[in-house]
Amino acid sequence: FAIFSLQANVHSEETYMYGGAKYFSYGVEKSDLQAINTSLIALGFSSSLSETDNSGFGFDVGFGVVMADNLSLEAGYVNYGTLTINTTLTGPSEKVKLDIDGNGVTAAVKYSQDGYYVKGGMHSWDFEGKVSASLGSSTEALGSGTDPFFGIGFGADGFEFGYEYYGIDDGDISALTLRFAHKF
């Protein structure tokens, strides 16, 4: 009977914590807004007009471990910010606001060379929507799943500026990111 043990010694200079801000573009298209309008008209409203700025701010925090000179593993939490869709209805007249919030966890492999980096992994996400109207509000789960994400960027002196793409079922979210990593 033999017991084999694999052990990775991680030194303090090989681990780091990161965090930063993200500016998201949510990928909502005119056809998505038209689907909302069509469903509201089907409920009996005379007309429906929906609009969104299709953007929001979020953040991420996490930990990384340097596995080799240019290779590290990262795990973290991401807040996808809030997408707001405003809808004006007539017949009867009503203003409706839909706020969609999301959170997720990420796991990625990151390769860096001469300050530039590329990373890829999976993110497990969860979104909910809150509808507010004159008669009150309601919050409902919109969906959850696990999909791929990737990022590219440049870093120096602990700061990183990059672009990230998150697949969400049959849609997507992209983000410009600014974060700081501190080795400990």
Which residues does each predicted region cover?
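Gram-negative (and chloroplast) outer-membrane scaffold detector with strong preference
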Residues: 13-16, 20-30, 59-131, 159-161, ...
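Cleavable N-terminal export/targeting peptides
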Residues: 1-15
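Intrinsically disordered, low-complexity serine/threonine-rich segments
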Residues: 7-8, 42, 58, 140-144
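Conserved C-terminal beta-signal and adjacent last beta-strands/turns
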Residues: 154-157
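Generic N-terminal initiation segments characterized by hydrophobic and/or small/turn-forming residues
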Residues: 1-3, 21, 37
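Solvent-exposed loop segments that connect transmembrane elements
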Residues: 31-49, 87-95, 129-142
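Catalytic phosphate/metal-binding cores of nucleic-acid and nucleotide-processing enzymes, i.e., regions
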Residues: 148-150
